[in-house]
């Protein structure tokens, strides 16, 4: 637990530093992260993924491969959720969030900030259960890719992880395995 807490504090410091844009502090935080990895360089992403996999196999024994606490909160409502979204053929094709994203990316361009978008998938097991069409989800991911392309920004596209066991904490939020993949993408982007 001490190792996990130390890694969390190092990561917290790294993200605070990135948000503040202080490159000296960023380099110091990266050195701490590398030292915490035990290999004197990059974090051992394969080992971190394996650790997340091992923990998931022990802790997430349900049909959606999510955290047991989240599953227990969801379980009483499962019967009424089955197939409920089968008519969601348009998915998330419209909404003010896409304009918000464009506004954010335009602001980044105006200020000379180089962002990276992370396309976080939804839990494919759960979304299939509710009948939310895979094609609608794919259109949603594609729309984000196109917006990123319009603004020439990099994308960490994790949309192919919808069916990765132990990737999610609950129906849509990242779990341990998901965070390892996001962390690796961010590490590579800011390296």
Residue ranges of predicted features:
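A sequence-level detector of short, solvent-exposed, charge-rich linear segments
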Residues: 24-27, 34, 120, 127, ...
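Long, positively charged, glycine-interspersed low-complexity recognition regions
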Residues: 127-191
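Secreted/periplasmic serine-hydrolase-like ester/acetyl group-modifying domain
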Residues: 1-109
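Short basic/hydrophobic patches in alpha-helices and adjacent helix-turn junctions
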Residues: 103, 107-110, 146-147, 188
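Functionally constrained cores in energy, signaling, and assembly domains
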Residues: 100, 108, 115-116, 183, ...
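Generic detector of short, locally flexible boundary/turn motifs and exposed helical patches
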Residues: 79-84, 119-122, 145
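Short coil-to-beta-strand
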Residues: 71-76, 112-116, 153-156
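Active-site segments of SGNH/GDSL-like serine hydrolases
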Residues: 105-132
């Amino acid at each position: 637990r001490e190792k996990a807490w130390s890694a969390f504090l190092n990561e917290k410091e790294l993200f605070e530093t990135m948000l503040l844009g202080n490159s000296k502090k960023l380099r110091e935080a990266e050195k701490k992260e590398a030292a915490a990895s035990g290999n004197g360089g990059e974090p051992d992403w394969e080992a971190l993924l394996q650790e997340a996999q091992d923990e998931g196999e022990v802790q997430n024994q349900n049909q959606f491969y999510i955290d047991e606490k989240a599953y227990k909160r969801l379980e009483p409502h499962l019967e009424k959720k089955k197939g409920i979204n089968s008519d969601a053929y348009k998915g998330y094709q419209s909404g003010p969030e896409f304009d918000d994203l464009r506004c954010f990316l335009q602001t980044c361009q105006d200020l000379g900030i180089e962002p990276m978008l992370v396309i976080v998938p939804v839990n494919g097991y759960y979304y299939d259960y509710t009948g939310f069409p895979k094609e609608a989800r794919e259109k949603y991911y594609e729309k984000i890719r196109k917006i990123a392309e319009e603004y020439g920004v990099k994308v960490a596209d994790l949309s192919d992880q919808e069916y990765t066991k132990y990737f999610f904490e609950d129906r849509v939020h990242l779990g341990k395995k998901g965070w390892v993949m996001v962390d690796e993408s961010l590490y590579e982007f800011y390296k």
